[in-house]
Amino acid sequence: MTVMSHLRVSLQVSSCTLLWRRFRVPRLVPLRSCSLYTCTYRTRNRALPPLWENLDLVPAGDRQSPINIRWRDSVYDPGLKPLTISYDPATCLHIWNNGYSFLVEFEDTTDKSVIEGGPLEHNYRLKQFHFHWGAIDAWGSEHTVDSKCYPAELHLVHWNAVKFESFEDAALEENGLAVIGVFLKLGKHHKELQKLVDTLPSIKHKDTLVKFGSFDPSCLMPTCPDYWTYSGSLTTPPLSESVTWIIKKQPVEVDHDQLEQFRTLLFTSEGEKEKRMVDNFRPLQPLMNRTVRSSFRHDYVLNIQVKPEPTASEVSP
């Protein structure tokens, strides 16, 4: 995910760059395991996206994101509540290319667009949403499930306005942020997403911004309420371990042409040598000692056949 919402002008207004530190990083991206056949033979020895050049990859944390979610290892928690989502379309402000993704930002001075319930103790205000995607449809998501990649992943970023005065403060502290992750898979055309796609040509270059009013991002959510949750971090600098992740089990369908429009965006500003905005995801991080909890029972999800109780006529005397 990216928290680069107030990061346009200087470090003073940047919740992402406040803690950036310079040091050496490998120029090659490690191989990312993937169960899709197209991922088994591909190489990932590409130059890092501009955001990661000359920056620390891991700040010695043990709750880093993204992770590979192992379905059978996740723990069903009956105490997890349903997630309640209430977004006011009128709070949508604009869409912009921040040089790493495209963000749709929202007015967040009041509780007009919030989530509550689920694993959360407080209401969290919607700040922005953005996507991560690959150079082709075989990969692109930040999280994986049983090592399976999806073509793209949506992140809806919320902050805890009960405990913190600002998004910038919340982004650096434990339990400061709640991010809903939604996988995108190839399928039918997504009508609501098309409104976003139609706007992308106007923000092709880095640091371009246009107004984008009256949009309810809940239309990008799957209908299934099931989710996984775990404690993690931002996936862009400063990589703060401030995030309660809520990863939706069910992906949403988009078509190939819509994803291709994502790939027309550029990491670079107008006048610079063009560099396509693709593969803007962080490599997988180790789970360490964390537990991934699920809001659903595994026997239902994995279609395990449960033997029915014997009828009275079948019971031996």
UniProtKB/Swiss-Prot annotation:
Localisation: Mitochondrion
UniProt keyword list: Lyase, Metal-binding, Mitochondrion, Transit peptide, Zinc
An individual GO BP term: response to bacterium
Binding site residues for Zn(2+): 130, 132, 155
GO MF, any single term: zinc ion binding
Principal EC category: lyase
UniProt domain Alpha-carbonic anhydrase: residue ranges: 37-296
Cofactor(s) it depends on: Zn(2+)
GO CC annotation: cytoplasm; mitochondrion
UniProt: substrate binding residues: 235-236
Catalytic activity: hydrogencarbonate + H(+) = CO2 + H2O
Transit peptide interval: 1-33
Function of the protein: Mitochondrial carbonic anhydrase that catalyzes the reversible conversion of carbon dioxide to bicarbonate/HCO3.
Full protein name: Carbonic anhydrase 5B, mitochondrial
